[in-house]
A protein has these predicted regions:
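Alpha-helical solenoid repeat scaffolds
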Residues: 1-208
């Protein structure tokens, strides 16, 4: 009850805090509110290996496969590849294959091509996978194959999920194109940024 009163006017900002508050609600008999907070907090909570095992066991009946997938997706977009690696075993098989490929790409580990080849067809155009492939190629100086990805993805906020992340890659690649005097191509990839807010928008509008 004391914890609930502390957060009467505003919810905790951290995922971990939401889980603790959710537990308090459940103990007080408010199962629905408690479950909602635990589900929300689980996605973004900063958990050690032992905390992950403990929380997973403790809140087993409140979490389903969708919650595990949401957490894996959050960790992948935040580039938390060691945390993501710990999550892989708890995901449904097809999602294990998707996030294994993403984890290997972002951690620059061995076996990337093999992992990508095992990704189910329905995920082959997953925005996160395409983003990680783009970043992997760009970091290796593979300009043409990076452009291949940018030319074939949908340039909408809904598809990109995190257009701010995509913009960082677009801007770096655009600068390489400008250096090579490929101005028209640079304009094309910067103008299709999909941003609608944030500091990246000003940068994108200026570059395009």
């Amino acid at each position: 009850k004391k914890i609930i009163n502390m957060f009467e006017k505003s919810e905790p900002l951290s995922g971990y805090g939401k889980i603790i508050l959710g537990e308090s609600f459940i103990k007080s008999g408010n199962i629905n509110e408690g479950t909602k907070l635990i589900k929300d907090g689980w996605v973004t909570a900063d958990l050690s290996r032992s905390e992950l095992k403990s929380f997973r066991k403790k809140y087993k009946k409140h979490l389903d496969s969708k919650d595990y997938i949401k957490r894996a997706d959050y960790l992948a977009w935040e580039n938390k590849y060691w945390d993501l690696k710990r999550m892989l075993r708890y995901l449904p098989k097809e999602y294990q294959l998707l996030y294994t490929a993403r984890q290997l790409l972002m951690s620059k580990s061995y076996g990337v091509d093999s992992a990508i080849s095992r990704v189910p067809k329905k995920f082959i155009n997953d925005p996160g996978l395409n983003y990680d492939r783009l970043k992997w190629r760009r970091k290796r100086g593979r300009l043409e194959s990076s452009l291949e990805i940018l030319d074939n993805v949908r340039n909408t906020k809904n598809y990109m999920v995190r257009p701010d992340k995509w913009w960082i890659e677009r801007s770096i690649i655009a600068r390489s194109l400008i250096y090579k005097k490929k101005y028209q191509k640079a304009y094309k990839i910067t103008s299709m940024h999909g941003l609608s807010e944030g500091p990246e928008l000003a940068d994108a509008e200026w570059m395009s």
